[in-house]
Amino acid sequence: MSEIRDDRQYTQTHEWILDNGDDTYTMGITDHAQALLGDMVFVELPNVDDEVSIDDEFCVVESVKAASGVYSPADLQIIEANEALDDEPELVNSSCYDDGWLVKFKSHSVVDLMDSTAYAQILN
């Protein structure tokens, strides 16, 4: 059973979003997604200040099995990328909700996300 944290919201494409307040958010891929992908070998992160439109791919996680795009849940601006993943992409596997986060972003339009209960239902 995949770990799902109650303090986050989730997308249909298996990303988690943590509201930091002040219209800033932290984002990563879910435990379910990292388990399906397998051992991470590379993460292509966006640049700070990149502006991304809703539903656009802005990041790629690459595992021994496949490469998978990460899609924007809103119109957003990247304010930080997790540079630790450059040297340790496996943090996405070992700590997807903590040290393995992908980006922090600013947005005024994050909507249509699922709470932990709704996300658990789509996994079953």
Swiss-Prot record:
Keywords: Lipoyl. The modification N6-lipoyllysine is found at K65. Residues 24-106 form the Lipoyl-binding domain. Its cofactor is (R)-lipoate. GO terms for biological process: glycine decarboxylation via glycine cleavage system. InterPro entries: Biotin_lipoyl, GCV_H, GCV_H/Fam206, GCV_H_sub, Single_hybrid_motif. It holds the Pfam family GCV_H. SUPFAM superfamilies: Single hybrid motif (SSF51230). GO terms for cellular component: cytosol; glycine cleavage complex. Binds 1 lipoyl cofactor covalently. It comes from the Bacteria. The glycine cleavage system catalyzes the degradation of glycine. The H protein shuttles the methylamine group of glycine from the P protein to the T protein. The glycine cleavage system is composed of four proteins: P, T, L and H. Belongs to the GcvH family. This is Glycine cleavage system H protein. The lineage of its organism: Bacteria, Pseudomonadati, Pseudomonadota, Gammaproteobacteria, Candidatus Pseudothioglobaceae.
